[in-house]
Amino acid sequence: IPKMPIMQYVGEQKNAPKIFEFFPSHTEDSSFELYEDDGETNSYKKDVFLKTKIESKFTSNEMHITIHKPVASGGYAEFEKKNYLLKVHLDEKPSIVLLNSRKLKKSKAEKLLNDISTAYDITGYVYNEDNKTLHILLPISDENLEITLMY
């Protein structure tokens, strides 16, 4: 489920994170395309937009999330520094979290959320035991992002 912070008007938070909330299925793969335009003009009528494909799948002991490189159409130029925040609802805590085959560092919740709209070179994750939710912070990239949760 794509989300964003609550704002009083379009563009209030220039570098607001893109939030994706996952309720993964153990039996079905899922995917969707996030469509974005500038939110202010009629440029979308001229096919000026950005699309980002997101996929997730489960295997017996891993969950895989792929955020594909955003694809611009019609000269869409807005590729600002922003972060992705993934909120993944899980039955159990993963033992390892990987980003493009590299182990991510565990963070403190306050640090992760404080950096969400100001730091664009930080990656990390935190698991909330109370609501069984894994939060992963990643900078938006011009490459595919492969997230692997191992159990």
PLM regions and their residue ranges:
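Short beta-strand element of the conserved SAM-dependent methyltransferase core
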Residues: 54, 125, 148-150
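Generic structural detector for well-ordered beta-strands
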Residues: 87, 135-137, 148
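Catalytic core of carbohydrate-active enzymes
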Residues: 1-95, 99-102, 107, 129, ...
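Low-complexity, intrinsically disordered segments enriched in Ser/Thr together with acidic residues
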Residues: 140-151
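Extracellular/luminal ectodomains and secreted, surface-exposed scaffolds of diverse proteins
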Residues: 102-142
